[in-house]
């Protein structure tokens, strides 16, 4: 597999120019809670679920002090519940909630208490977000960035990043691999990936010359066929020496099979139960990026998106601009033999993608400091075009598509807070979707 070195294109879409290009999609937006959202580092993974049994949608979001809140939408009554605070966030933007529904109907919220431990909160009753939730400590394994999903047979996986130095006190601070935990009994008991495979970690490295041994998964997406698509970048101190998150570098892609716990490349190469540095550089490298801070932006950004068209993956990601201009947005497409990468827009923070049909995906994106969510379409994993603008009263910082969504509760928009301090929580919570006829 070959990676593509980035080359600038002459003509790309301008974020400003696309705001006037209205497509056919007609979104409605509901403000479910006003002036409640704190800054959050949440990834576009597991924000909410639709429960067909009771015809309700459940969403999660981070409020003041990064405390976890849930709300429910009753599709029969067309009403939203008041926010229910269910867990403490310990005043850290990393401690945001992620939500899945266990096979027994209970809602589960996972939080990685920044570099300390992985916690789970369980709803007191199945198919309901009401009441006082029960909290469980899954492990004290220096966990951050939980990414949960539930397989067809009800097995629960939670991927997370480990800060190894906080466990042994000696490993360089920029060694931070990915691991996971697994439950086969609706979250009652857990085993780690090391317990199950014997591998020290699932994705990672320990001895790169550039000290880029931190893994930042931008998005993890489980498909209907069970495959889990993953896009990620590296971080670390660079050649100057060990330092957490001084630089970012490169884009990588893999997919994971929960049935045998093996990872695979886009070409189908079986990499076994662990991805190490040799694997990722030989088989998973999508785009090679310079070890710099363009316009003082860590690049590629922490957030990326992954989708597939007829089984072929595509990725969205962005970087700062060396000349000080707007952010540069890239689309990488697997053509069956290698990766092709092109610049498709400027000035956007791509937040989430949603499958529209066999050939088309919708992209949700924002512009820094501005309200509204802009949407775009990616067709055949290659062709980018503007779609519409979804109006919001205030800027939006995070977007997640609800699992198995039912309109009008399709996408969760967490509003941007006015301050990085999570004691300040003045962003709105919006839910967007199409009007049901």
Language model: regions and residue ranges:
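Secretory targeting and sorting signals
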Residues: 1-19
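Extracellular, repeat-based ectodomains that mediate carbohydrate processing or recognition
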Residues: 20-437
